[in-house]
Structures are given as structure tokens and as C-alpha cells.
Amino acid sequence: MRQGYSPSYPLRDERITEDRLRFANLVRRQVYILLGLGLLSLTAMAVGALATWNVADPSFSHATDNPVTNALGYPGAVFSDLAMQFFGLASVPALLPLAVWSLLLMIRGYIGRIARRSLAWVGAALLFAAIASCFAVPQSWPMPIGLGGVFGDMLLRIPGFFLGGFPQGAIASAIALVLAFPALWFCFFASGIIGRGAEAVNPAMLSANRSADDEFADEDADNEAGGGFHFIGALTHLVLMTTATIRRMTGLGRRRSREDDFDDMRMVRRSAETRNAPPPRARKARVEQTAPSPKPGPRAQREAQPSFLKDNGIFEMPSLHFLAEPKLVQRDPALSKDALEQNARLLAGVLEDFGVRGEIINVKPGPVVTLYELEPAPGIKSSRVIGLADDIARSMSAIAARVAVIPGRNAIGIELPNPKREMVYLREMLASRDFEQSKAKLALALGKTINGEPVIADIAKMPHVLVAGTTGSGKSVAINTMILSLLYRMTPQECRLIMIDPKMLELSVYDGIPHLLTPVVTDPKKAVVALKWTVREMEDRYRKMSKVGVRNIDGFNQRVGLAQKKGEPIARTVQTGFDRNTGEAIYETEELDLEPMPYIVVIIDEMADLMMVAGKDIEGAVQRLAQMARAAGIHVIMATQRPSVDVITGTIKANFPTRISFQVTSKIDSRTILGEQGAEQLLGQGDMLFMAGGGRIQRVHGPFVGDDEVERIVQHLKLQGVPEYLDAITEDEDDDEGGSGPAGTGNLEDSDDPYDQAVAVVLRDKKASTSYIQRRLGIGYNRAASIIERMEDEGIVGPANHAGKREILVPTGDDDF
């Protein structure tokens, strides 16, 4: 036998240990059934005692020599007298939880939340007593207290204290109606009819429910109505358990596959009679639980959202209440321990049928898919297993199956969709502690991993993202989640947005929020101009950072903020020339008037339309931004629904190391985006493959956000202030005029001051914009912007409106006539 392998047949000691465990579980199960029968008997005796109650029977409150007429004798007379004295007629409905508890013990073997349900039982009994006391006492009532007993009268004295007397008539009826709902809720909760969605499964009973009787146990857990059928199911459960245990102990069930405890379960491969192949070895496989929901951060626990100071007031961040709250759903029975074990064995058998030898070593269930980790036998090529993705999906009766090598491990991941898909909500991601306490400067909530863990990415480190996917794959929803992730963390002073939407549908809803630098660009020609402006802004930022002597935008903002805090201007010493007499260099101190620079995120929703209009210009601008804009704080999120080589060119791919692929139609499109196949096997609706820097691919399930949620957030942001648009972003420039010299300024050569020339141009042409002054005077953008700001300060032109236009306030010669 080859070293390192062992037979797949179980050892004798393991079988004995397993049989002992099953026998112990069987005994424990019978104890619970006996306890349930005992409790049911006591409940029936209590009902019989109350049904035959007679006030004349001897008891603690009546010392008489009359014969006992109660069906249970003197103990029944004492019990019924005490119950009627304290609770009155409410003693009868108060016995309902006890009857349900007895059935639960016999069927399920445990009662969840017993402490809380006991308190709810007491509360229900008291409320039922108060309701009974609200009714008028008939003349035939033999007791001097109300129908609700002592406790009912005591509770009604509370409203009587405020009403000035014991409630009667219509007031008593109203009080009874008010108390009816909480009384029923307490009664149902105490009985276990409601409030069972979050109960934990009793681990002691798991092993007892793992045989041929699993179907009965599942039916009992799902269908809780009908006590008679459940009792029959419990007896059938007992018979099957006893038969199965006897067969195992006598050796008849040795060839049946056994399941150990869930955390240390053993995956046994089906033996394949292959020539020169050693028998498969049995290894312990670890089945992981789904990661718990992300823990909410401090922001989700505060009632009011934090406020950030702004120059013209207070900017209030959007509230998490604008987003839909995650719904509580019960765990899918298909993801139970037994079901995962069975699927793992079935998958191992399918692989052996196709000639792939190996074993399942790990199982990771998630909200959308389940990952089965396969450790192949020596000599098995990973490409062979990857090529079987369609055959595996067919054999496992799944919609699709994705097979990929797990980086850094000797394992191949096989991802199969769950029968029931769970929804991932954006509110759950933004309220999580991982997102709020993330140190990322521009954090994006991408979604959850296969195991249910949140994925928070930093676009400042990416530094650009390429998103691709077909229509309906969830690409537009992912763009919205990225935008909302920025809006929930960044103020307009910290991050500004440029949105380019040639489709005129997806991003137009954000038009008017204060984070925008320009209205949403829908014209492809203006989109080219906006990208060129972004390139010029990047170059201008680099010049500013060079003057200050820093290497990135964070260092620049820190340096400028520190100078503003101290009240000291930033100055530098520059050489202006040489002294004519001595020849020594002349140095002057230049004061720099600088402000902190916000991050700029350029969002392009459809790249294919732009490439059709101006492919070379778009590709050149995107290439320069992708190569150089990271240190300047400018980042690009580019999306397309046509992932072909004419849209995603080699130049663009080389400069976008971070890529996200949603469902595509073919393997060729998947290779175009990610460099490998697999995206064609995605499930759609936010299911994505996230490739971070370095080529490591991770499957992520994106969160969902509805249009109504986006509209509520946008309306809130619009109330915080108007956007400060820059008209130069979308105004086309005539490079030919600007390169040769000032255009149209022949009559202004007598003035050496550019400001005077600019004022004359504005008054003559009645046009006031930064780009217009820049073209007419042949000066740089920064200088033209300073001139326009000076004109606004001196009252020559007004502030820019929502479209970026300015009104000329100084009357011209034409206005006099």
C-alpha cells in the first residue's frame, strides 16, 4: 500500500464510539418524551380540577365538613380554589402554554428561551385576569371578588386610581380591548407559537436526528400546528431510531456512511476501482458556519447622525433610516449540516464519475453560494477540473457552477448556488462596524464574501476601478452602492464627483447634490471635454504639491491645514534673477494662498458610447488619469456593459489593475475583463468577481439598493446646500487659439494688466466664464479663475447659477439706450 494513504473503511473503535453516542442520544430523547408526557398529564389534571371546581369543597379558604366533589379529590379542590381565588376564570387560558410545552418536549426535545417564556406566561396570566375583571359579575358568581380573582382586581385599581373609581361599563370594555392584544401576544410567545425564528438548535439533539428519520424531524420543526399528528410523528421517530440503532449495533449497517459531529465530520469518498490507483484516504473535513451578520457600529446605535461644519452652515450626513432595513429570515433547511454532508458526498461521487480523484476537505456555506474545497489527488491537473464546470452543474442539478484554484493552497474551490438566495442589503453594510471603523479614505461597501463576511475596499489604494457586466447583472446597482458609500462618509469639502452618464438614465437622479462639480454629463462630446479638464486639474494639483514640497494629496492637505490652524501663510523662497553689479542671485519670498483640495471621483457609467464618439481622445485621457492621478487624489470608476476588446483596450486594462466583473455571456468576455474564465458562471443580480491588485480574484455578493432609497438620500442632500459648479468642466476650448496667443484682444493691447483686459472683454462680449477669459487672453486656467473670482468680489459679475452661468452686474453702453 502506498505510504500516506489508508483504507476508507471505518475502524472498530470509531464505530463503537459512534454507537455509544447514538445510544446516549436515544436515551436522552426518551427522557424528553417522558418529561413531555408527564407535563401533559399534569396539565390535563389541572384542567379536570378546574372543570369540577366547587366553592363548597373543603380547601385552605373553606374549612367545612362537606364531602369533596372535585374529580381529583382534596388536592384538586385545593388547587382549583387557589387558582380561582387569585386568577379567577383566567386560570383556564393560563394552562395553554403548559400544554404546548409538553408537545414541544415530546416532538423537538427542548423548549427554547425557557426563562423568557416563563416570564411571558406569568404576564399573560395576569393580563387575562385583568380582562376577566373588566366584565360585570353575575349574580350566580359565588365569590366576593371579581371574575379575574385577586390579581385581576388589583390590576384594575391602577386605572381606577386615575378615573376616580373602579372601571365599569364602556370604560371597562375599552380597557379589556386594550389589554387583549398584549395578553394574546404574551400567551402565544409563552406557548412558543411565535418568537421561534431566532432560537438556537439544541446541539444535544442534532446527532439523534441524523438517520432515516430526518424527514420526520424536519416536518415537525416546520409544521407546528396539529398536536395529534406531531404526537404520531414522535412515536414513529422513536420506532425508527430504535430500529436503526439495533441494526448498527448488530453489524447490519456497517456499510452505510456515518456522520460524526458537525465540526469534525468525516468525508468518505466512494472507492473507485482505477488501475494503479491507491485506495482513497479518509480525512476529517471541516464544515464552517456562515459568518454572522456584520456587527453594527456606533453610528447605527445613535439616533442622530453626526454633523460636519461647513462654511455656510451645517452639513448633515444622510441617515441610515433612508435605506431599507434587512429582513429577518430563517435559515434555509438546505444549508443544514446533514444536507451539506450529503451534497459533499454527492459532489465527490460526481467528480469520481468524471475521473477526478480527490476529497472534499472543507465546506463554506454562504448567503448565495456554498464553497466546496476539493483537494485533488497527486497527478490531477487543475485545468481538467476547471473544464468540468458545466458537467458538475448538470450533475448537481444546479444553475451554474464555478470552479477555480484557491490561491496559496493545494485546493480547488467548487462554488454551487444555494436553493434559496439571501438578500444582501446596503444598510447592513453601511451600519456595520467594519465600514464605520475602516481606515480607508474612500471606502466602498462592495458586498459580502461567500462566507458572509463584509468586503470593504478603498478606492484611494486601487486607485481606479473597471466594472463590466451584461444588462441585468447588477452593474448599475453596484455603481449606486459605490456612490452611496462615498456620500455616507464624505462631505462636499472632502470629496467631489464628476458623473458621466451617456445613457441619461442611471446617474441623472444625482443631479443637484452638493458633491457634484458639474451637472451630470450626458453628452458624449462634453464627456470628452470633462475628462480633458480632469487631466488639467491633475496637472495643476501636481504643480501645487510641487510648490509645497509634498508627494500626495494627503500630505498637501495636512500641510495646508496645519498652516491654517496656526494662522501662518505657506511661503517659499524662489530665485528671481541676479544682481547686475555683484552678480549674486536674488531671492524673494513667495507666499502661497492655498486651500485644502478635495478628492475627485470620476464616474463613467457607459464607456462603450464614449469610445464610439471619440475613442482616441477618451483612451488618451483615461490613460493619463489612470497612470498619474492617484497621488493627486483623482480616481476613476468606469463601467461598461459591452466588455469587448474595442471598448476595454489593452491600454485601459493595463492601467486598471482593479476590476469587477458581473455576469457576462461568454468565456471570451470573462477573459477580456479578468484574464480568465468564470464570470460567465455567475448568477446575476449583484453576483460579482472582484479582482484586486495582484490578480487575486474574490467572489462577492453585492448589496441591493432600490430607486426609492436613492431618491430619499438625494432629496436629503439637496436640502443641505446647492452645488458649486465649475462651468469650465464642460465648456469646449479652442486649443488653436490658445496656443498662438490672445484671440480677439487686438483693441486691448494698450493695457498691460490682464485683469483690465478681462474686464473689457466681459463688458464688451457680455460673457463671463473662466474658459472664455482663458481663450480670449491666452492665459492659464488658474489665472483666469482668479480673475473671475476677483470680478465677483468687486461686483462686476454675479455668482454662478445652477448651470454655471454668471450675470454681468455692471451696466454697459448698450444698457443706457
Swiss-Prot record:
Source organism superkingdom: Bacteria
Spans through the membrane: 31-51, 87-107, 118-138, 145-165, 174-194, 226-246
Region (Disordered): 252-304, 731-753
Compartmental location: Cell inner membrane
GO cellular component, one term: plasma membrane
Principal location: membrane
CDD domains per record: TrwB_TraG_TraD_VirD4
A matching Pfam family: FtsK_SpoIIIE
PROSITE patterns reported in the protein's UniProt record: FTSK
The keyword Repressor is annotated on this UniProt entry: no
InterPro entries: AAA+_ATPase, FtsK/SpoIIIE/SftA, FtsK_4TM, FtsK_alpha, FtsK_dom, Ftsk_gamma, P-loop_NTPase, WH-like_DNA-bd_sf
Gene Ontology terms: biological process: cell division; chromosome segregation
A GO molecular-function descriptor: ATP binding
Domain observations: Consists of an N-terminal domain, which is sufficient for the localization to the septal ring and is required for cell division, followed by a linker domain, and a C-terminal domain, which forms the translocation motor involved in chromosome segregation. The C-terminal domain can be further subdivided into alpha, beta and gamma subdomains. The alpha and beta subdomains multimerise to produce a hexameric ring, contain the nucleotide binding motif and form the DNA pump.
Protein purpose: Essential cell division protein that coordinates cell division and chromosome segregation. The N-terminus is involved in assembly of the cell-division machinery. The C-terminus functions as a DNA motor that moves dsDNA in an ATP-dependent manner towards the dif recombination site, which is located within the replication terminus region. Translocation stops specifically at Xer-dif sites, where FtsK interacts with the Xer recombinase, allowing activation of chromosome unlinking by recombination. FtsK orienting polar sequences (KOPS) guide the direction of DNA translocation.
Sequence similarity: Belongs to the FtsK/SpoIIIE/SftA family.
Identification of the protein by name: DNA translocase FtsK
